[in-house]
Amino acid sequence: MNEQWLEHLPLKDIKEISPVSGGDVNEAYRVETDTDTFFLLVQRGRKESFYAAEIAGLNEFERAGITAPRVIASGEVNGDAYLVMTYLEEGASGSQRQLGQLVAQLHSQQQEEGKFGFSLPYEGGDISFDNHWQDDWCTIFVDKRLDHLKDELLNRGLWDANDIKVYDKVRRQIVAELEKHQSKPSLLHGDLWGGNYMFLQDGRPALFDPAPLYGDREFDIGITTVFGGFTSEFYDAYNKHYPLAKGASYRLEFYRLYLLMVHLLKFGEMYRDSVAHSMDKILQDTTS
């Protein structure tokens, strides 16, 4: 990290800066000053607005009493966007039961006007999504997310006409199921995989790196099931505090498909079979 670049940050008396691994979108650093330790994210060649949605999400988490990093500052230096947050010290272990309770607490926050979406778009390193407010979840999830992913996969040569035929069948099935399901606009993390939570040194769970959205809470829960990191204690505690509706086990596959399509777009052919398997499951399984 260039010292001249660091001089533009609103942090005084920086003693040490060291890279932090784990993400695939941002450069991440631990920054120590004379008085405190901070977490710095940098997105090269992007405007300050790149972090606007994440900042808004973290602020909503704070208002909801969700343990998460607190925003300190954001801005732009030499054409690079940055975000400074409090640094959360990770502990050795924690309670999956408490994590389930925390996510249930997050999802209990409802959009006051009953709208689905968010005040800002999702901006990722490889794709962006329109979050304009909608009256129904299906428009946000299917029209704005899945259809956009389908178009991008086709445009980038990762899907062909045969894939689109299968997708169109899957799409009809998803729409039919969501029209029967009563969705409520809960505050979502938006990217709740195992790498976006941690246990602090006192054992408390914390959430970070949100892609905020008001939507059906099954979206978050479905994403938790793709790559692991969540135990049966997590799901038992979540369902005890905020039980999922009948048929959730089938609908969760919709959100697994979404995440796998995102990964196919980001990482290529290695996820092609996983996406195909997920679409087959949606077509073959029945609501339980």
From Swiss-Prot:
Function statement: Ketoamine kinase that phosphorylates ketoamines, such as erythruloselysine and ribuloselysine, on the third carbon of the sugar moiety to generate ketoamine 3-phosphate. Has higher activity on free lysine (erythruloselysine and ribuloselysine), than on ribuloselysine and erythruloselysine residues on glycated proteins.
Family statement drawn from the similarity comment of this UniProt entry: Belongs to the fructosamine kinase family.
Lineage top rank: taxon: Bacteria
Documented EC number(s): 2.7.1.-
First-level EC class: transferase
Keyword Lyase: no
Entry keywords, A to Z: ATP-binding, Kinase, Nucleotide-binding, Transferase
Active site (catalytic residues): 191 (proton acceptor)
Pfam families hit by this protein: Fructosamin_kin
Entries under InterPro entries matching the protein: Fructo-/Ketosamine-3-kinase, Kinase-like_dom_sf
Catalytic activity from the UniProt record: N(6)-(D-ribulosyl)-L-lysine + ATP = N(6)-(3-O-phospho-D-ribulosyl)-L-lysine + ADP + H(+); N(6)-(D-erythrulosyl)-L-lysine + ATP = N(6)-(3-O-phospho-D-erythrulosyl)-L-lysine + ADP + H(+); N(6)-D-ribulosyl-L-lysyl-[protein] + ATP = N(6)-(3-O-phospho-D-ribulosyl)-L-lysyl-[protein] + ADP + H(+); N(6)-(D-erythrulosyl)-L-lysyl-[protein] + ATP = N(6)-(3-O-phospho-D-erythrulosyl)-L-lysyl-[protein] + ADP + H(+)
Binding, ATP: 86-88
Molecular function GO terms recorded: ATP binding; kinase activity; phosphotransferase activity, alcohol group as acceptor; protein-ribulosamine 3-kinase activity
Protein name (record): Probable ketoamine kinase SAOUHSC_02908
